[in-house]
């Protein structure tokens, strides 16, 4: 079934009032007469409408559906990677149910964003998140922040109950699953902090581990986007069991 993201008030109406992007997407879809289209507001509510070809509108809605439980609040702090690899990270994070994505610029990030570029980039990343939510049947849309420098990200770590960081330290830290299992169900929100391809600088790692729990992601070195998906999968599975 095709899905469109709309403003919350659109779901209250008998004839759907679509925002410009959703209306454009609907036109591309070319729905058939009577075809059901699901609208969602990104805040846990969905409603199905039928395409009225004669009037060119979505009407005859079914009852409004509200998600009864919000997913466990997960935050991904991830150093920005190049091009499509970062887009893929956002997409998979949405599919795995994160509540917030914090793009981070650390000393060894290949991607460098001037302050004036960050707003436009964040808008693009939010569109990627919206597309991922629409395609994955997600009903909650995560908050996607503008890219922040590493010191700012450290301050944001304080907003999570507990944050876990992949750390290449000696001796190796405990596996991520074991570390998470020790914290649940006591904490109310979790975060994952993933470094850049070149890893954190020693100073960054020391500062991060004053605020985050060091963990191991396994015996091999993972690429940044792989580490993000692996870590979020572990956290999501652990939260689902707790």
Language-model regions: role of each:
Residues 32, 46, 69-73, 96, ...:
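Short connector loops at helix/strand junctions that flank enzyme active sites
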Residues 36, 85, 197-201, 220, ...:
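Gly/Ser/Thr-rich beta-alpha loop segments that engage phosphate groups in nucleotides
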Residues 202-242:
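Structured adenosyl-cofactor binding patch, chiefly the S-adenosyl-L-methionine
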Residues 163-205, 213-217:
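Active-site/ligand-binding-proximal alpha/beta "capping" segment
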Residues 1-66:
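N-terminal positively charged helical leader segments and presequences
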Residues 67-165:
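RNA substrate-binding interface of SAM-dependent RNA methyltransferases
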Residues 15-17, 71-75, 188-190, 208-217:
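Glycine/charged-rich beta-loop-alpha catalytic/anionic-binding loops adjacent to active sites
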